[in-house]
Amino acid sequence: MTQPSAIDDILAEHAGLETQLADPTLHNDPSAARRVGKRFAELAPIMATYRKLESARADLTAARELAADDASFAAEVPELERQVDELEQALADLLAPRDPHDGDDVVLEVKSGEGGEESALFAADLARMYMRYAERRGWRVEVLDATVSDLGGYKEATLSIKSRDAARDGVWSRFKFEGGVHRVQRVPVTESQGRIHTSAAGVLIYPEPDEVAEVQIDESDLRIDVYRSSGKGGQGVNTTDSAVRITHLPTGIVVTCQNERSQLQNKARAMQVLAARLQALAEEQAEQEAAAGRASQIRTVDRSERIRTYNFPENRITDHRIGYKSHNLDAVLDGDLDALLDALGKADREARMAAE
């Protein structure tokens, strides 16, 4: 059974949010309006399930009363009892403690590691995999910065991935387990003897704060450098000093952005990425003992720390954390990630329940 106090709190909060959203003055503060709208969307599945449960309970009560006078109604009772049980469990699951960042957008970084050009090409494959998955979900993807290798791979790249609408389960809820070392086994394009090589690329992922102002950043802690954006030539290349590099001196975190049209826009996007990284760092430092609460992420790209292997000769993908295997590597790299991400989410929920 659901704890009455838990759902009562949700009902009261939902009513309060409805009142705020109906107030025209709320939209005088766009930041507050986004925050209220996002929370309202997060509560929507809970409210929908609660209303279905209340309706099913009323139907069950009525069926039992009718069955007392007319035995022909008794046949309906078991099915209604089953519906009530299922909805009670669904509501309990929705009310269970969850990652507070699940509704957030993300900043995702891919970095090449061991393997030279082959590693950079694989890093680009990973970036495309996430982009294609995002396209399937209708999310917006922006490449904030990229260092391209001689063969067109990514030595490193930073992506911003945003959902188009506020939702209980946002980008972070799907991608939060992707941080770590990804290993590839295949014949590189640079291999003339047809031998299979093993190389690695790393993924780092951070929930993005709704507003940079949510993270305290002292301007005196920043070194901001501007330089000319790099490119391959042609009309689209920005020939002014519009690229921005921000160094956060206390932590040594460096963020660059060069894909926007102006220095001001690049600085704003770089500050968003910096805020996401500082938020993640602060949470990691505050929760060192709670590693099970979120996926541990790489700090060095080392094949020995792999979370997943992509085996091209066998068309197989293996996630070593949960023992997941499938032979549809080509589809996965084309963005067909749901089965894998669902399995990771299920394993995480089971681990959380076992720890309680």
Curated annotation (Swiss-Prot):
Q: Where are the transmembrane segments?
A: none
Give the main location. Answer: cytoplasm
Q: Which residues carry this modification: N5-methylglutamine?
A: Q235
Write down the InterPro entries for this protein, in alphabetical order: PCRF, Pep_chain_release_fac_I, Pep_chain_release_fac_I_sf, Prokaryotic/Mito_RF, RF-1
- Cite the post-translational modification comment: Methylated by PrmC. Methylation increases the termination efficiency of RF1.
**Protein origin, superkingdom:** Bacteria
Any single GO molecular-function term of the entry would be: translation release factor activity, codon specific
Keywords noted in UniProt: Cytoplasm, Methylation, Protein biosynthesis
Q: Which SMART domains match?
A: PCRF (SM00937)
Which Pfam families does the UniProt record give?
Answer: PCRF, RF-1
Q: Where in the cell is it found?
A: Cytoplasm
- GO CC, alphabetical: cytoplasm
Record-stated family: Belongs to the prokaryotic/mitochondrial release factor family.
What is this protein's function per UniProt?
A: Peptide chain release factor 1 directs the termination of translation in response to the peptide chain termination codons UAG and UAA.
Name of the protein this chain belongs to: Peptide chain release factor 1
Quote the gene name from the UniProt entry: prfA
